[in-house]
Amino acid sequence: MTAVLRHCFTALLIIFISLQAAAAGKNIPAEINGLNGTLTLPENTAPKGAILFIAGSGPVDRDGNSPASRTDSLRMLGDALSDAGYITLRTDKTGTGAGAATVTPADITFAGYLRDYQAWFDFLQKRYPDIPVYLLGHSEGALFATLMAQEQKPAGIILVSPAGYTIDIILKKQMSTQPFPPEALTYINDVIDRLKAEKTTDNIPPSLNILFSPELQRYFMVWMQYDPAEELAKVTVPGVIIQGGHDCQISPDNGARLIRTAPDNQYAEIATMNHVLKETPADCTAAIGSYNNPAQPLHPELVPAITRFLSGR
């Protein structure tokens, strides 16, 4: 074989291998409404279904990371469920990823997030019309999944670390564990009560603006109107609630309230899983390291809990 032929053969082989990789489809970029996402496809097997991931609150990107935390939890979960035979779609939220620099706080709204996820769900259904499409919501994302399921009728919903109470109750509980002086905690609770009554508070002290900026107050005001348990009771598609026993942000009694209100759903409590889906001790201070340790794997019981639900569909 001449050098030229060898070169051509090598080039063709590279193209063939690249096409094989694309056909196996490990990671495919996706884009809708100016937002970016990653489709992860199972290799060498027909997909059993497709799953849209809906991330938790704050500026969380498609991998489950934010400026304050890097866990790679959603990336790991997407890869693991792809290995189990499912297409997964992980997306950046408005305000994260490549377009973050062009977004102002006023652009981030509860209704806007909901519209974005509804558009991603439609994208998945149109792209894969012959397989079931599921919603997987983490933390606040579980509420979005619940609200979407009332209208768009996915094949099922997977609620991971979901709140079971309105966010005003969750916020008060979370704030009570922080080292605020009593007068500051009273002020915080008063602001939360006003938001629950759909009233904003002006002249927030600078030290609390990160919690109660004008934009966040408007966001919380909408969020607080939804009781996750009452909304889940309206859903008619199958669901599973997966709660972590060592979750210091959303305690297991949240999942217990959801399953009491909507008993047709499945329920799994993973005793040693925390809010970012890692295995940690019960002590919240000791578990802080998992919020910035992308090398730490997912809790080993999480993926089996999800696939048990999916395989029963």
Located regions from the model:
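Conserved alpha/beta-hydrolase
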Residues: L74-A100
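Short beta-strand/loop motif that positions the catalytic acidic residue
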Residues: V235, I241-Q243
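Short alpha-helix in the alpha/beta-hydrolase fold that links the catalytic acid
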Residues: V237, I250-T261
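Accessory cap/linker subdomain of secreted extracellular hydrolases
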Residues: I158-A229
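Catalytic active-site module of serine/aspartate enzymes centered on a nucleophile-bearing elbow/loop
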Residues: V276, A282-R313
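Short, surface-exposed "cap/lid" segments of acyl-processing enzymes
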Residues: T45-P47, I51-L81
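Alpha/beta-hydrolase active-site loop
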Residues: A106-K126
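N-terminal cap/lid segment of alpha/beta-hydrolase-fold proteins
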Residues: A24-T45
